[in-house]
Design a protein with these regions (language model features):
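Extracytosolic ligand-binding ectodomains
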Residues: 1-114
Length: 114
């Protein structure tokens, strides 16, 4: 539902389907806004602490849940995989035989130390 609402709002405003990058930028700015709200500040150190609090910021983006790892601020999300195919329903290729690999299955260990 979140994704459908995002696509509809984007198409209404810009007259075209959103790209993958459009959704990522939208989600990234919303994650930043959540951290600023949580910090009650725009000061960098306060926002950093908000990103890292409680095991890392979590945001339910249009494409799914994203989690920021507190140690290195890497954002993890489910990995979408599939075969591309063209249909008359869309002016671009879509994914067929879609598979979503959980973020925990693709996360790599951080080398960052605090």
């Amino acid at each position: 539902e979140r994704n459908r609402a995002f696509v509809e709002a984007y198409r209404k405003r810009f007259g075209e389907y959103p790209s993958y990058n459009a959704e990522e930028a939208y989600a990234g700015l919303h994650m930043l806004a959540r951290a600023v709200e949580k910090a009650k500040s725009t000061q960098a150190e306060a926002v950093r602490r908000a990103f890292e609090a409680d095991g890392g910021l979590v945001y339910d983006a249009p494409e799914g849940r994203k989690r920021m790892r507190p140690e290195d601020h890497q954002v993890f999300e489910g990995l979408v995989w599939g075969y591309t195919k063209h249909t008359p329903d869309y002016p671009f290729a879509i994914l067929d035989r879609l598979r979503i690999i959980p973020a925990n299955d693709t996360a790599y260990p951080t080398q960052c130390k605090r």
